[in-house]
A protein has these predicted regions:
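Electron-transfer interface patches adjacent to heme c in soluble/periplasmic c-type cytochromes
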Residues: 288-357
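Conserved acidic residues
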Residues: 72, 124, 212, 248, ...
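Glycine-rich beta-alpha loop elements in corrinoid/cobalamin-binding modules
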Residues: 38, 42-169
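Protein kinase-like catalytic domain
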Residues: 139, 215, 241, 300-303
Length: 357
């Protein structure tokens, strides 16, 4: 039997959506939370585990410490804004449960594994980058020296094992919606631009683009684009519809949903019979989504991320006229242009801004 494992998106300051839940850790104008999808994958692989999303479910630090007292392994997804409070929580958990092993995961510890281990003696392991199988192997008792992608202490020194390669077979991973159904209350999740209640998940990992504003590819999933099969995605969506018949929108929170045009069209065709309302995060190149080829009449909202200047891939990609011309009457999109970054040139920002008006 593996160690009894608690996967934790830790409690934080009021209305802060960070750590495991958010691509953009933030306190927003209205209280809103994303799903802790990264923690759901390994949670689905370990018998007896639990995924605790403290911020969205209103679980206090004191309650979290008591819950952690019943587990042998704690996997905490930290963030840069929340790291200081997460250190305090880790020490409190260790005081309550001296035998528990504590693992920190997420972009912050991936970028600064040695510093994080030195700053917090309560941390036993840091799992860098994609941590799904690293966490599972630790829970199953594999020797730390044999686990790829981790940093840890040994004889007073901090050791850094070789990186774990990006996961290629995404179909082998559990369906996160099974873990959501088991451990989470979907009524606790709301995002202003999505219909309520919503459910979010991934169909791909990684992104070859080098956009400076995007967290996951830069510090967690990397730039190697990997995809689930369209059959696997459609199967999970059919099951999710049975789990939650009242869900108003399913959101594919991929770094870039529409990188491969043929796959996008194929997946849209398999989703159409399910009669779902769904949306996705996309590069600002959506002809396959908005044209009749995809037949995705239930594609509700398309966040189109555009960064002017330095990392603009094609100038035409931020021209919205083509979307207006190609989209069907039941399709909606929104753009999120990014401005005032250190990489931007004034002229490029002005030109890009004009094309979005």
């Amino acid at each position: 039997m593996p160690l009894r494992t608690l996967f934790l998106n830790p409690p934080s300051f009021e209305n802060f959506d960070g750590g495991a839940a958010s691509r953009w850790p933030a306190t927003r104008e209205v209280e809103s939370y994303w799903y802790p999808v990264w923690l759901a994958y390994p949670a689905g692989m370990l018998e007896g585990s639990r995924l605790l999303d403290a911020p969205s479910h209103g679980v206090s630090a004191g309650e979290t410490i008591e819950i952690a007292g019943n587990y042998e392994l704690l996997v905490l997804f930290t963030s840069t804004p929340g790291f200081a409070s997460d250190i305090l929580l880790a020490h409190a958990v260790r005081d309550r449960n001296p035998n528990i092993r504590i693992v920190f995961v997420g972009p912050h510890v991936t970028a600064l594994p040695e510093k994080c281990l030195r700053d917090c003696p309560a941390i036993d392991f840091v799992c860098r980058k994609e941590f799904d199988y690293s966490v599972v192997e630790l829970a199953q008792g594999k020797s730390p020296e044999e686990v790829l992608g981790i940093s840890y202490r040994k004889n007073g020194a901090i050791m850094h094992n070789a990186d774990r390669p990006p996961i290629e077979n995404l179909d082998a991973l559990p369906h996160v919606t099974d873990v959501y159904k088991r451990d989470l209350n979907i009524a606790q999740y709301e995002i202003p631009f999505l219909r309520y209640p919503y459910v979010s998940l991934y169909t791909t990992r990684g992104c070859p683009a080098q956009c400076t504003f995007c967290l996951w590819p830069q510090a967690l999933s990397g730039h190697a684009w990997r995809k689930r099969s369209t059959d696997d995605v459609a199967g999970e969506m059919a099951k999710a519809k049975e789990y939650w018949p009242d869900v108003q929108e399913f959101f594919f929170d991929d770094d870039t949903f529409n990188i491969q045009k043929a796959r996008t069209i194929e997946l849209c065709a398999k989703l159409k019979p399910l009669k779902l309302t769904w949306s996705c995060t996309s590069r600002a190149r959506g002809d396959e989504l908005f044209s009749g080829k995809a037949g995705c009449n239930n594609c509700h909202a398309e966040p189109l991320w555009t960064e002017p200047g330095w990392n603009l891939h094609q100038p035409s990609e931020v021209c919205i006229d083509s979307f207006q011309a190609d989209r069907g009457p039941d399709m909606r999109y929104r753009t999120s242009p990014i401005g005032a970054l250190s990489t931007h040139f004034k002229a490029a920002s002005i030109t890009t801004g004009a094309s979005l008006i």
